[in-house]
Amino acid sequence: MAAPKNDNVKQRILDAAIKLFQERHDVSLAEIAKAANVSKGTLFYHYRSKAEIYLDIGEQYWNKLSDDLLAWVDNAEKDTSIPRLVRYTFIRGVFDESGVLRLRLFVEAISGEEGVVIKARLNDQYARFKNILKDRIVERMPGADGEQLAWLLLALVDGLMVQNTLQNESIDINAFIEWMAANFSDFQ
């Protein structure tokens, strides 16, 4: 039997880490190695810290979100008007199963040993996604301040993701999303 490809091993490690991180925060590298069915040495070869694992998880999340958004918004057969773009961005960002993991990534960025590295990568990922949103907003709302509107969307998505993760029943997130979709053009 051939040895597994590095990409497969790395993905197995990430999949195991995601599952464990969704259950709790205090997961050791040894637990991740065991869950991924790899040796500690193999895990260390790919990841020297939990922070590196969190970063790759975050990178996968942002890449998937970006790729999905681009595939949707660039599909000429779809209605990708501003209300639909806003609704799509909120639904994908707020209700995605990665909410708990994203919050843990924020915690690592703020208080983890490698916080500076995580902050830099997170900021790069936010800037990349902001630029995608900005370009799509300006295409649909010529003359609008796409930069600020994209940041507004991202800040609101993160805030609603926190409220959704906390299961805050005092806010009707779906109603808020519909209100934003209907009124977003007024913010230009």
Ranges and model annotations:
Residues R12, A16-E23, D68-W72, L101, ...:
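Solvent-exposed, amphipathic alpha-helical segments
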Residues V116-D124, V138-Q188:
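Hydrophobic/aromatic-rich alpha-helical bundle segments in the mid-to-C-terminal region
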Residues D56, L70-D96, E139, L149-L153:
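Hydrophobic alpha-helical connector segments
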Residues R12, A16-E52, D56:
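Helix-turn-helix
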Residues M1-N8:
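N-terminal intrinsically disordered/low-complexity leader segments
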Residues L29, Y54, I82, G99-L103, ...:
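A general structural signal for well-ordered alpha-helical segments in protein cores
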Residues Y54-K64:
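Alpha-helical DNA-contacting segments of helix-turn-helix folds
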Residues V94-A120:
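Amphipathic alpha-helical segments used for helix-helix packing
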